[in-house]
Amino acid sequence: KHWKDWLKENGKDIGYVFLNRPHISVKYIDAVREFTNARVIYYGHDLHFLREKREYELTGDAALLQSSADWEKKELELILAADMAYYPSYVEEQAIHEIAPQAKVKAIPAYLFSDVEECEYHFDKRKDLMFIGGFGHRPNVDAVKWLANEIMPALVKKLPDIRVYILGSNPPEEVEQLATENLLIKGFVTDEELQEYYQNCRISIVPLRYGAGIKGKVIEAMRFGTPVMTTSVGAEGIKGAESILDIADEAADFVEQLAALYQNEAELVRRSKASYQYIRDNFSFENAKKVIGPEFDLE
């Protein structure tokens, strides 16, 4: 309630301020600049304007185009007001520099893993597919609807016994009613249960048609050595994704590649090992320290 008074009184002793997400940061950045001499770091997580623009391109909803323009103005103001802006991948960095070349922005590792224990991929002990995503996020709802309506009918013809587990909190009625004997809507699962799904399913599927930024569900699957089938949106921000992930944007191509991968033991084992290696190479504490060192005087 009285945070501004506190900041005014103590601001001289604050060396760094780390702000997260545009709708939160916009409330504080002016006061931080007014009452402190702190180095301000802004972490945007993803580009809201880019995500909403892509949703507009998919749906044609004019309100999304206006919302995208509003977000772009707000996000750019925050980026330019900060001493440095962080984003989870090179994709956001490039997108920002295209519209604001003067912006100070860099990609940082979105996730950090101190110890990646590699488990052997046992093809014969794994079966079925999984999707994980919170349903308060519109792209996840769209992904499951596209999966159910455009992918599952053809996939079941190729793999009649296949099951796809839909995991994630608060599935709306429009998702619940998509359930079939092959598409199981499980809803919320604990971290322990989620890890069991990663260890028992052959493939994690991420059929996102829009969104922005590096996708946590993709990195998480790779962290557990579970091969991923996704779209170019799902693979966004992962350098060299084609050698680690299977990627298709059209439903027919998605089905063909997914069915082939599901039955290819050697390729699944290779992708599992490649996933572990990618995580070790790109999401270590040592790597993060090198990237953020200049801003926090860690060098």
Named regions from a protein language model:
Residues 35-52:
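Active-site proximal beta-strand in glycosyltransferases
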Residues 263-296:
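A charged, aromatic-enriched C-terminal amphipathic alpha-helix characteristic of glycosyltransferases
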Residues 14-15, 83, 199-213, 224-226:
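Acidic donor-binding loop of glycosyltransferase active sites
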Residues 217-221, 227-231:
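Short hydrophobic beta-strand element within catalytic cores of glycosyltransferases
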Residues 48, 63-85:
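Membrane-proximal helix-turn-helix segments that form the acceptor-binding/catalytic region
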Residues 80-86, 98-102, 106-200:
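Conserved catalytic-core segment of nucleotide-activated headgroup transferases in glycan assembly
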Residues 244-252, 260-265:
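Conserved acidic donor-binding segment of nucleotide-sugar-dependent glycosyltransferases
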Residues 7-27, 41:
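Short N-terminal targeting/anchoring amphipathic segment
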